[in-house]
């Protein structure tokens, strides 16, 4: 009886370990389960040059709060492009694309509409001095569309020899200007309680077609196994 008890524990621990490696994100109730997951990626430009090789950086795909079919987030968590946008897709995981390619119908990229400074070039952008003051700044990749996408189960051999799903995303990125508006901070945030302070909040975007860029995000599903780590 004692031997059986010990064996049962070992089997349970081993099974739990295997499941935890393969299912790092719980997506069982997701309406987009056939898309959803963690994907280790590389990025290729329009000249077919690899501009970012595999190093463990990931894209994560998951359902929106509405949890409806073919509406999902694509989140470049390593901020390689960067990209974090909601996409409405048509098709199936084996062959899909954004249901709309029109800039005005696309959602904002949450990684690039943040208040300044967005990067070092904006370090000297002054804070607003009054309510309603506006500023427009050049920003990359304000919105994006999926031109072509494919997720194929169990066709990739990882660096460690394991089997994983393949990911192919050809995305078009739209750049332009992001406009921010000055709003008054909460009084508890003022350095001097008698002097009002203001901050920038996102207002809207405008599109510059001359700055369009297209990239391929290519990779495979994250396995969690040590031998597949970069």
Language-model-detected regions and their locations in the chain:
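Positively charged n-region of N-terminal signal peptides that target proteins for export
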Residues: 1-4
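Sec-dependent N-terminal signal peptides
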Residues: 6-14
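Alpha-helical interaction segments
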Residues: 11, 28-29
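C-terminal motif of bacterial Sec signal peptides marking the signal peptidase cleavage site
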Residues: 16-20
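Bacterial signal peptide processing site
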Residues: 21-25
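First exposed extracellular module after export/assembly in secreted or surface-exposed proteins
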Residues: 29-230
